[in-house]
Amino acid sequence: MTTDSHYGAIGYNPFEGLELTGRVKKVFLRGQCPQDLDTAKNIGSHDPVEQTHKVMQNIRQLLEEVGGKMEHLCKVVVYLTDVRHREAVYRTMGEYIKGVHPVSTGVVVTALARPSWLVEVDGTAVIPDDAE
């Protein structure tokens, strides 16, 4: 089976991949939630867009702290408590990863660790040794 035939059969490419060359740093981010990284205090909003902004800001901050950028994200897993939030969450995520197309998996779950959380995103980044 070729990538092309699989793409045509299901409407997307399940074989998106990444080839690592040279020295790189691979970063695994735990699930980021709509809370302050320093205090673990929730943002106090039940809006999926506002929660997603905070989640993506956390991801950006953590990547920058280890010398990376959002463009280094190669994989994300998005956990939602309500499938109806999917479009708004993905649109908001797109504001942070314009031009970046990480492999993505979306999962709808019954609940997250705190009842007020609507979205959680974990990610994997590959940062080249010569990243600026």
Provide a role label for each language-model segment.
Residues 1-74, 80-132:
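N-terminal presequence-like segments and the immediate start of the first folded domain
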